[in-house]
C-alpha cells in the first residue's frame, strides 16, 4: 500500500462544501478488515508536491516485496478548490514520477485515484487497473476496498468525459479569461456534446465504467 492518500484521504471538497466528518476511514486503517495480506504501507511522496527521495526509496523497497502494489494518488486540496481555477489537468509530477519508477520494479500496480474532476491520464499505461474513487466521503476507503477485494461488483460510471489532452477541451482557447468577465463560448457544446460533435478522441467517454458481468 503506497501513497499519502492511503493515510490522509481526499474525501471531500474545500471551501463552503467542507463538512466536519464524524469518522473518516483510511485505506491504511481499513485494509486489515479484508482478506488481503499487507506487506507494508508507506506514503511514498509528499502531498504538497516536493520531491522526497527518502520516501521514494522506502516505496520502491516495499514494492519489490509485494505481489501487487495499491498506489493511492490524486489531486490534493490545493489543486482544486472553491474560487480557484485550475491552470492544467495534470496529477502532481512527483506522484507520477514515483508511479513510473514503481512500475520498473513491480508491474502489477492498481492505481487508486482520488480527484474531484477530470485529469489527464498519460500515465495510464503504468497501471494494470485503475479505480477512481473521486471524493468518496468519510466511508470512501471501505467502499473502494469492497470493490478491490470483490465484495461488491464495480458498477460506477464516469459522469464526465476524460480528454486525452487539456488542449482538446472546448474551453482551452479562451480560458482563463483575461478580463473580469468569463465568456462561456462553448454554448451547448460542453462535455460529451462537444467531443461527439467534433469527433475528438478521448481517454474515457462520458458514462464509461466496468463490471464483472458481460451483458448482451
Which sequence ranges carry the predicted segments?
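C-terminal non-catalytic regions of proteins with extracellular/luminal or membrane-system context
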Residues: 1-216
Amino acid at each position: 500500500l503506497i501513497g499519502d492518500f492511503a493515510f490522509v484521504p481526499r474525501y471531500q471538497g474545500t471551501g463552503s462544501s467542507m463538512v466536519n466528518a464524524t469518522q473518516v476511514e483510511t485505506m491504511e486503517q481499513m485494509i486489515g478488515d479484508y482478506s488481503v495480506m499487507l506487506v507494508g504501507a508507506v506514503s511514498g511522496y509528499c502531498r504538497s508536491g516536493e520531491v522526497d527521495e527518502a520516501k521514494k526509496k522506502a516505496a520502491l523497497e516495499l514494492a519489490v516485496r509485494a505481489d501487487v502494489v495499491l498506489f493511492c494518488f490524486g489531486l490534493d486540496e490545493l489543486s482544486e478548490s472553491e474560487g480557484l481555477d485550475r491552470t492544467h489537468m495534470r496529477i502532481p509530477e512527483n506522484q507520477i514520477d514515483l508511479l513510473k519508477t514503481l512500475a520498473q520494479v513491480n508491474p502489477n500496480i492498481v492505481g487508486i485515484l482520488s480527484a474531484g474532476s477530470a485529469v489527464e491520464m498519460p500515465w495510464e499505461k503504468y497501471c494494470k487497473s485503475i479505480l477512481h474513487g473521486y471524493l468518496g466521503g468519510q466511508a470512501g476507503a471501505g467502499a473502494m476496498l469492497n470493490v478491490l477485494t470483490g465484495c461488491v461488483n464495480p458498477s460506477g460510471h464516469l459522469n464526465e468525459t476524460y480528454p486525452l489532452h487539456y488542449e482538446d477541451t472546448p474551453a482551452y482557447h479562451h480560458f482563463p479569461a483575461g478580463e473580469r468577465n468569463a465568456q462561456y463560448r462553448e454554448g451547448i457544446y460542453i462535455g460529451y456534446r462537444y467531443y461527439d460533435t467534433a469527433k475528438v478522441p478521448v481517454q474515457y467517454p462520458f458514462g464509461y465504467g466496468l463490471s464483472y458481468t458481460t451483458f448482451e
